[in-house]
Amino acid sequence: MKKTLFIIVCIILSSVAALAQDYRQAFVDVQQEFEQRLPGTLGHLQQYLKDYPYTTYSDEVQLMIGVLATEKGNYKQASKVLEQVARKNLSRQAVPMWYFYSGYAYIQQQEYKKALPLFLELKKQQTLYTPHAKYYAGYCYYCQQDFAHAMA
């Protein structure tokens, strides 16, 4: 009886380990597709969330979906998706991307008061997005007719 129970436990544990490898590899695959902006990436990201609904990468995948929506000009959808992302669950490299694309989607919807704090926070960081954040923060001030801050 103990031997049978031991075998069953071993099988279950090996299955769990294999499943963990599957969701990690699937994430790496969709992440590479996203980085290359391959056709069909959006569908693959959405399918990943369906296949692995409790993955630790769900916020990263949601971020990618929001970025793609922003790049396609679907700003309202992008904002909706990006607002659901828990920033604390993102990798350190992904956080500046979240700030930038969230702010940019707001600007495109003329929601400057929502966009401005995101760009101001991003200005404090040294990332690829920092020069853009400086410009868009000034633009937000300008659109709100705060010309003194816009020129700073």
Which residues does each predicted region cover?
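Acidic, polar-rich low-complexity tracts and alpha-helical solenoid repeat scaffolds
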Residues: M1-C10, A18-A152
